[in-house]
Regions:
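Class I SAM-dependent methyltransferase Rossmann-like catalytic core
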Residues: 2-64, 72-74, 78-91
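Conserved beta-strand/loop positions that form the S-adenosyl-L-methionine
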Residues: 68
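Class I SAM-dependent methyltransferase SAM/SAH-binding core
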Residues: 73-155
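A short acidic, Gly/Pro-enriched loop at the edge of an enzyme's catalytic core
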Residues: 157-169
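A short SAM/SAH-binding and catalytic strip from SAM-dependent methyltransferases
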Residues: 166-184
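Conserved beta-strand signature within the Rossmann-like core of class I S-adenosyl-L-methionine
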Residues: 191-205
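Conserved class I S-adenosyl-L-methionine
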Residues: 202-222
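Class I S-adenosyl-L-methionine
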Residues: 221-272
Length: 285
């Protein structure tokens, strides 16, 4: 099975020490100063897509949403709960919570999120190779199903295959590049009916191989033409120039986008053609 460009070393700073901690506090403490914001942009988009799916397919209640590279369940928190990314950042960098043991923070988080769950919340499945991060999201109730699996390396477990079978929507806000066609092949092989796919993808990473793969399952991929979305500031000049080099390889320019000091993402939405005809992307977003 080919896996065209999945790569663990493509010019981005190494934040491995925050991706698999016992709780999200180091994650927010590190990324906050870099104005990390892509889950904020994802919140409005994923809620709009979930609403559209419920309108087009009212029999799908609750929706089944799979968040790929889910980390601590941030996208799910923003989809299913009355919170913002700013709320979460403030919470996890607050002095009051800074000294709490993880087990006490988890207990507080369970209460915090339970009081803010939206009535139309989707059933949430999270997949990430970071076992402690996924475990925390499951422990505090953000994920209904949590799988610490690396689909770039191994086939889905039987339990994950069973859970994936009823998926309505796949979301991802930054993992493409770390996961690529091999992961998406294994996801689709576990889904009798192809779901919608919404992916925020760094402009430094080509999405065409994944779009072509999705097309073979009957999904048409559209790129939102009107704008890009900031992910976060570059951590340093080395990261900045690596991004510029990657853009050049892809025939893209940084002017008006990455030249502002931020990574920028494109939004790709993949759906069956009848769903696109019923609700064009321009009306949907």
């Amino acid at each position: 099975m080919s896996n065209t460009t999945a790569n663990d070393d493509w010019g981005k700073a190494n934040f491995n020490d925050i991706y698999d901690c016992p709780d999200p506090r180091p994650y927010f403490a590190t990324l906050g100063p870099l104005e990390y914001q892509i889950p904020h942009h994802g919140q409005a988009v994923f809620r709009a897509l979930a609403h559209a799916l419920r309108c087009l397919h009212p029999d799908r209640t609750p929706l089944n949403v799979v968040d790929l590279c889910c980390s601590y369940g941030i996208n799910t928190a923003l989809l299913n709960y009355r919170v913002t990314l700013a709320d979460l950042s403030t919470r996890y960098t607050s002095h009051r919570l800074s000294a709490l043991p993880t087990r006490h923070l988890a207990a507080e988080d369970r209460t915090f999120f339970a009081a803010r769950r939206r009535p139309e919340a989707a059933t949430a499945t999270g997949i990430d190779s970071a076992a402690r991060a996924v475990g925390y999201a499951r422990a505090v109730g953000l994920l209904d199903h949590a799988f610490a699996e690396n689909l770039e390396v191994t086939e889905p477990s039987p339990a994950l295959r069973r859970t994936l079978a009823g998926t309505d929507l796949i979301t991802v806000t930054g993992g493409v590049g770390y996961v690529f066609t091999r992961t998406f092949t294994r996801l689709l092989d576990s889904m009798p009916t192809p779901p919608w796919v919404a992916a925020f993808v760094l402009r430094t990473v080509p999405y065409r191989p994944i779009a072509d793969l999705l097309a073979r399952s009957g999904l048409v991929t559209e790129k939102l033409p009107t704008r890009t979305f900031r992910q976060r500031r570059f951590a340093d000049s080395a990261e900045r120039y690596a991004a510029f080099d990657a853009l050049a390889v892809n025939g893209l320019h940084a002017a008006g986008k990455e030249a502002d000091g931020f990574y920028h993402t494109d939004l790709y939405v993949s759906r069956p053609a009848p769903d696109i005809a019923a609700l064009p992307l321009a009306r949907l977003l």
